[in-house]
């Protein structure tokens, strides 16, 4: 065991309290759990690129998807359950992953997952340099390998992730596959499935509305679920907003008058696949003055709704340490990001302006309407894990929501006293009909699931 080797490697020193040292060692060893799994040969292959051989530590299955990388130091349970990673093979740049295990699916007082961003592991595959078979954390209930195997997600360790990331950075995000227990046939290009050709949002969005009540509700926000993260919902509910979450293609403009605000969530894939969402948002802005806030894919869909364009980045931004400049104040925030597309700021209409800009690559990180309470960010102000420099944006948004509610109550005094036709008390309390990742083993199966 690593922990045992650690203590054996410590130089022996005379101590006035040998029993104390022994107690500390025994207590430390008691927190370390073994999550060893049987290893099998595995191969990570980049289409038209290098091949890497390693060891399997997840599910015994073959998958393909888009290979992307994250430089995040911590937060692998949150990253791997983020619906934005649906259909992607996630390469971790950190040399050791899994050392604090995987926590349970415990829920908080709002009925939201405390440690995961969705109920299931969302990434199609996992690539690491080294995986920790022994793990230690008070919340851990299983190892990373056990979790991947249980969720049906293949994972590979013992590969040169530095070489992989260098290739992806220079050549751009590429299609790749993980094969377990067999050699890759270079002639089988049909084995590479491009998730960009699949409507991934349709897979991860709730299939029916659900409702989460705040402990002390002050307003009611409609959330458009394109693959929403649990901590986004928590960031709204913990600030006094009860939320009703709708499928990505729900005609939100038809029910917006029952809400005090509309929120558009993050999600996976190409934003142009969600044309119906963009259309409903456009109709919403034409027919209502309700405050709107979008994050990540929600930012991109809002841009499409106002006639702007989106572009695909070479290798995307996926990290917890990306600087974004607030163009209205000149302040810089360290932000958490996970996206492969960006908004082309040069295509924004005249009544909109850029809100944030990425100080690494100068890509757009946000936009804001010049006169209406509508704004969006490409980064994640709710970051989990990651910095919370920009979490105040939720406060700005909900302040505008409360002001809108007050103005509507002034014009319509009976608005809040009338029974709601939404019957939110009868709605589900969690996501409806969202299935675990299918890996992308088969195009037909993926299309059918979509």
Swiss-Prot record:
Family annotation (Pfam families): CPSase_sm_chain, GATase
Quote the EC number: 6.3.5.5
- Database matches in InterPro entries: CarbamoylP_synth_ssu, CarbamoylP_synth_ssu_N, CarbP_synth_ssu_N_sf, Class_I_gatase-like, CPSase_GATase1, GATASE
Superkingdom of source: Eukaryota
User: Which reactions appear under catalytic activity for this entry?
Assistant: hydrogencarbonate + L-glutamine + 2 ATP + H2O = carbamoyl phosphate + L-glutamate + 2 ADP + phosphate + 2 H(+)
NCBIfam families recorded for this chain?
A: CPSaseIIsmall, PRK12838.1
What is the name of this protein?
Answer: Carbamoyl phosphate synthase arginine-specific small chain
Q: Which organism is it from?
A: Aspergillus oryzae (strain ATCC 42149 / RIB 40)
Q: Which gene encodes it?
A: cpa1
């Amino acid at each position: 065991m690593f922990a045992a080797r650690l203590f054996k490697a410590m130089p022996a020193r005379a101590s006035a309290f040998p029993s104390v040292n022994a107690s500390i060692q025994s207590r430390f060893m008691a927190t370390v759990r073994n999550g060893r799994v049987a290893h099998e040969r595995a191969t990570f292959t980049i289409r038209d690129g290098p091949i890497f051989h390693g060891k399997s530590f997840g599910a015994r299955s073959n998958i393909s998807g888009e290979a992307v990388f994250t430089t995040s130091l911590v937060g692998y349970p949150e990253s791997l359950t983020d619906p934005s990673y649906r259909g992607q093979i996630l390469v971790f740049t950190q040399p050791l992953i899994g050392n604090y295990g995987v926590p349970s699916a415990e829920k908080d007082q709002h009925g939201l997952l405390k440690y995961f961003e969705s109920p299931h592991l969302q990434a199609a595959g996992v690539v690491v340099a080294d995986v920790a078979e022994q793990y230690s954390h008070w919340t851990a209930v299983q190892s990373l390998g056990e979790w991947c195997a249980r969720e049906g997600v293949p994972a590979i360790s013992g590969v040169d992730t530095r070489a992989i990331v260098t290739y992806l950075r220079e050549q751009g995000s590429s299609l790749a596959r993980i094969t377990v227990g067999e050699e890759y046939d270079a002639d089988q290009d049909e084995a590479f499935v491009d998730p960009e050709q699949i409507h991934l949002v349709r897979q991860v969005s709730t299939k029916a509305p659900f409702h989460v009540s705040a402990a002390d509700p002050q307003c009611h926000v409609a959330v458009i679920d394109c693959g929403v993260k649990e901590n986004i919902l928590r960031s709204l509910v913990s600030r006094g907003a009860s939320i009703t979450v709708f499928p990505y293609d729900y005609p939100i403009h038809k029910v917006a008058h029952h809400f005090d605000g509309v929120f558009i969530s993050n999600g996976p894939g190409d934003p142009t696949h969600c044309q119906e969402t963009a259309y409903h948002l456009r109709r919403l802005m034409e027919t209502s003055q309700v405050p709107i806030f979008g994050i990540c894919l929600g930012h991109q869909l809002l841009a499409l709704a106002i006639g702007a364009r989106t572009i695909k980045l070479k290798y995307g931004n996926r990290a917890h340490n990306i600087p974004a400049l607030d163009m209205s104040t000149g302040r810089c925030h360290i932000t958490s990001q996970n996206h492969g597309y960006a908004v082309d700021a040069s295509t924004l209409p005249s009544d909109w302006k850029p809100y944030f800009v990425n100080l690494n690559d100068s890509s757009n990180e946000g936009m804001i309407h010049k006169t209406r309470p509508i704004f969006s960010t490409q980064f994640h102000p709710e970051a989990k894990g990651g910095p919370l420099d920009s979490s105040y944006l939720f406060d700005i948004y909900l302040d505008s929501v409360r002001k809108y509610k007050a103005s509507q109550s002034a014009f319509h005094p009976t608005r809040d006293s009338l029974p709601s036709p939404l019957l939110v008390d009868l709605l589900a309390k969690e996501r409806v009909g969202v299935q675990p990742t299918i890996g992308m083993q088969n195009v037909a199966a993926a299309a059918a699931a979509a």
